[in-house]
């Protein structure tokens, strides 16, 4: 077993989810590649006296289900999984697929059925507000190809950023959080960009390995109607 996998599993259980004895955790595995990590998460869950529940899916199987998906089907699936999710204290979701565009040809209306009738009740209404959750991807050849590098090189990069000391990072973020929370006006200046806005009384939220791995940001939002200026994007954007 790769020691880096053991470290990641330990951090997910102890730091991200802070699992305690008797708590129940839903471990969602998408793809076969994350299995070594999922097995280690199960072991670590048992070590703390918590109870693991595992559900596994692949993009290719989900594609076949979605191509013929009906509202009745998605409602029943949601009803079953809502009952399970309501009993969970935590959720760990790991995705690792070979083909990142496996579901590219699934009709939009089928995706919409899943989003409305399954994802919304199970995840948005129960999992997100009522469990300790963390989600991440597992390194695969598809991800390495997207990064234009070898799998080994990508794995090194992946574990270096996923196995950071996020507790230490969170402590270091406090100074930025304090600064942002007492700031009113913000101005961003770069090539072809000069934009200003207010963040007064908008909370600054730090993200340090609690819900996403890898992680590392402090975010806020501008006060509505306070934005003025010009911004230029270096990549295509819907907006």
Which residues are covered by each model-predicted region?
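Active-site bordering "gate/hinge" segments
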Residues: 1-230, 235-239
């Amino acid at each position: 077993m790769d020691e880096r996998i053991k470290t990641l599993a330990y951090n997910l259980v102890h730091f991200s989810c802070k699992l305690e004895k008797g708590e129940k955790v839903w471990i969602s595995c998408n793809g076969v590649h994350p299995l070594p990590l999922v097995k280690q998460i199960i072991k670590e869950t048992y070590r703390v006296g918590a109870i693991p529940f595992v559900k596994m899916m692949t993009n290719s199987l989900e594609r076949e289900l979605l191509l013929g998906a009906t509202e009745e089907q998605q409602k029943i699936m949601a009803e079953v999984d809502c009952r399970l999710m309501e009993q969970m204290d935590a959720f760990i979701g790991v995705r690792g697929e070979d083909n990142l565009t496996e579901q590219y040809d699934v009709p939009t209306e089928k995706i919409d059925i899943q989003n409305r009738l399954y994802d919304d009740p199970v995840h948005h209404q129960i999992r997100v507000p009522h469990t300790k959750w963390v989600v991440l991807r597992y390194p695969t050849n598809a991800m390495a190809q997207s990064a234009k590098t070898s799998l080994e090189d990508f794995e090194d990069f992946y574990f270096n950023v996923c196995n950071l000391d996020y507790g230490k990072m969170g402590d270091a973020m406090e100074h930025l959080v304090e600064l942002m929370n007492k700031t009113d006006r913000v101005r961003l200046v770069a090539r072809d960009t000069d934009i200003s806005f207010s963040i007064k009384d908008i909370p600054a939220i730090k993200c340090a390995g609690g819900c996403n791995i890898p992680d590392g940001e402090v975010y806020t939002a501008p006060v509505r109607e306070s934005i003025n200026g010009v911004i230029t994007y270096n990549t295509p954007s819907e907006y």
